[in-house]
Amino acid sequence: MRQKIVAGNWKMNGQIQQVTELVSQIEKLIGFDCAAQVAVMPPSIYIPKVRDCLRTGKIVVGAQNVYPKDYGAYTGELSAPMLKDFDCRYVLVGHSERRQFFHEDENFVAQKFHHVKDHGMIPVLCVGETLSERENGKTEQVIAQQVLAVSAKGKDCFRDCVVAYEPVWAIGTGKTATPEQAQKIHQFIRDLVGEINDSDAKHLTLIYGGSVNENNAKALFSMPDIDGGLVGGASLNAKQFVEIVKCIN
């Protein structure tokens, strides 16, 4: 079901005191009726602590990564059943940093995507082009390849999931796509999914990630196919993050 979402990806930041203070501050500041589902995605070791700190029901917890097997000899990895034990609702798959630094290809991302869905959680499929791909006119080609990679399991594969458009050139750089640039790609993704399943395309939640902050969020979220944001650096500041959440109202 299409809904408004603002998710904070904390990446590899914070230790236990900082994480505890951050989630408590965010929850305290969200003392208003929020139009969006708010999620925080801490480093995996702190997921239980963050979950236990939540009191109001206005914030849910998510995970930044998952391994696509239920159990086994995969040293250092976490499975979807493990994440589900700690009430994770959302799981990122295909984030550009995983693709870049850990060489995760389309097939592996697709395995993660379906592993998360098979265990009743919501995968957040991250897609996006590099600066060179954009400059060479390959944006739509790259996005289509990344989106369609998960579609092999049938026409219902985009039901109950989120797609996050995160142009790689805008992540952590301070640069951001204009609202019009982001809208164009979000509409392209919705149309692409519509070729597989029109009903699921209409109900698909599409969010934007790429240097989202309190200054650009309102304009981005006003676009017809942008349903929220995947927030990086700004989510590490409680006040800034909540200001972004307010922009969805």
Swiss-Prot record:
Disulfide bonds listed in the record: none
UniProt keyword annotation of Transcription regulation present: no
Matches recorded under SUPFAM superfamilies: Triosephosphate isomerase (TIM) (SSF51351)
Cellular component terms (Gene Ontology): cytosol
Top-tier EC class: isomerase
Reactions catalysed: D-glyceraldehyde 3-phosphate = dihydroxyacetone phosphate
Residues the record marks as active site: 95, 166
InterPro entries in the cross-refs: Aldolase_TIM, TIM_sf, TrioseP_Isoase_bac/euk, Triosephosphate_isomerase, Triosephosphate_isomerase_AS
GO MF annotation list: triose-phosphate isomerase activity
UniProt cross-references to CDD domains, sorted A to Z: TIM
Major subcellular site: cytoplasm
A Pfam family that the UniProt record links to this protein: TIM
PANTHER family found in the cross-reference section: TRIOSEPHOSPHATE ISOMERASE
Entry-linked NCBIfam families: tim (TIGR00419)
Protein's name according to its UniProt entry: Triosephosphate isomerase
Organism field: Legionella pneumophila (strain Lens)
